[in-house]
């Protein structure tokens, strides 16, 4: 959850990208949970496959699929109906699916969604769910409201759990990686540009946080991103949660 497991996404790490191309040339099918460590656990912060493993652990402990667990404990209590890991089983959501676009240098071209997203081998805790912006905001609103949905009144998290989610967890990690350099590097420029994280950042149990006040953002605010330039933030001091989704690659293109 803190991304110090030693697992890294290939798009941000040359060593993992090299392994992926060598072991699975041309993007052949592979089991993401079989990806090797890029560093020893606890040694360095690196954005990667940790949440995929967290989702897998939830499945093993609960005896439920990740989708069923999320439906029971998050989606249903929040009144969310437009979110799923299995988009091919939801014709109603497929009909509303926003196009995925890539910048070619002369403009944007619509491209197909990757097959592992449309027909997943497993339900990915790191980025396998399709959801509407309204559904995503319903989750953020519950977190902003101390774990209680302001719409349904259902509690999905203890208030103390929400507080713990905002506590920096990486300040004593020996290798701060991108948190220290302020730049999340890229190994696959077609998918992501180098991402400026800025200085004075840490990772919590769930997100990037700024240790000091920034322009328009209170100290201790939450933020993170999706690869297709999808952004979210929570500022608890100001009582604001916000999203901005473009659904376009590469990540970080200005």
Which stretches of residues belong to each language-model region?
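Short, surface-exposed loop or secondary-structure junction motifs
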Residues: 1-216
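Hydrophobic beta-strand positions
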Residues: 57, 233-234
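Extracellular/periplasmic catalytic domains that process cell-envelope and extracellular macromolecules
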Residues: 198-200, 234-237
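A conserved acidic, glycine/proline-rich C-terminal tail/linker
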Residues: 218-221
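Short, small/polar residue-rich loop motifs at catalytic or cofactor-binding pockets
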Residues: 226-228
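Short, well-ordered beta-strand elements
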Residues: 231-233, 239-248
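Generic C-terminus detector
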Residues: 248-254
């Amino acid at each position: 959850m803190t991304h110090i497991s030693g697992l890294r996404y290939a798009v941000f790490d040359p060593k993992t990208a090299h392994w992926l191309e060598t072991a699975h040339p041309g993007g052949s099918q592979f089991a993401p949970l079989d990806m090797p460590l890029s560093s020893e656990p606890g040694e360095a912060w690196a954005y990667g496959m940790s949440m995929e493993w967290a989702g897998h652990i939830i499945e093993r402990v609960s005896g439920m699929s990740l989708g069923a667990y999320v439906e029971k404990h998050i989606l249903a209590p929040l009144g969310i109906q437009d979110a799923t890991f299995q988009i091919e089983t939801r014709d109603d959501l497929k009909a509303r699916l926003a196009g995925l676009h890539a910048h070619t240098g002369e403009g944007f071209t619509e491209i197909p969604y990757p097959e592992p997203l449309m027909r997943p081998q497993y339900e990915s805790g790191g980025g396998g769910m399709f959801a509407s912006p309204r559904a995503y905001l319903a989750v953020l609103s519950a977190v902003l409201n101390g774990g209680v949905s302001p719409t349904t009144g259902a509690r999905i998290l203890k208030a103390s759990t929400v507080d713990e989610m905002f506590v920096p967890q990486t300040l004593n990690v020996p290798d701060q990686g991108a948190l220290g350099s302020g730049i999340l590097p890229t190994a696959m420029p077609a998918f992501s540009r180098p991402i400026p994280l800025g200085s004075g950042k840490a990772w919590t149990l769930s997100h990037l946080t700024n240790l000091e006040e920034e322009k328009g953002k209170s100290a201790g605010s939450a933020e993170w991103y999706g690869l297709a330039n999808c952004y979210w933030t929570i500022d608890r001091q100001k009582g604001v949660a916000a999203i901005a989704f473009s659904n376009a690659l590469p990540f970080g293109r200005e």
